[in-house]
């Protein structure tokens, strides 16, 4: 089963997460099918904290992918941020 979830990167005490579509049998930071965005929880200043390719998320969901609870929360948060601008 394909899952859209967070894969941790960054360094100690400075996390950075890639939002990836991966097989659920693979490890959290292991092999993935496609990177669909990123989340930087410690973004400061002009750094971008969250970017998601909604078209790719929709593609994977239409092909049966499940969103992890955290990924679903971030997608919802990003859509709320984009909607008022549009």
UniProtKB/Swiss-Prot annotation:
GO terms for molecular function: structural constituent of ribosome. GO terms for cellular component: cytoplasm; small ribosomal subunit. Pfam families: Ribosomal_S16. Keywords: Ribonucleoprotein, Ribosomal protein. One of its GO terms (biological process) is translation. It comes from the Bacteria. InterPro entries: Ribosomal_bS16, Ribosomal_bS16_dom_sf. Coiled coil: none annotated. Belongs to the bacterial ribosomal protein bS16 family. PANTHER family: 30S RIBOSOMAL PROTEIN S16 (PTHR12919), SMALL RIBOSOMAL SUBUNIT PROTEIN BS16M (PTHR12919:SF20). NCBIfam families: S16. This is Small ribosomal subunit protein bS16. The gene is rpsP.
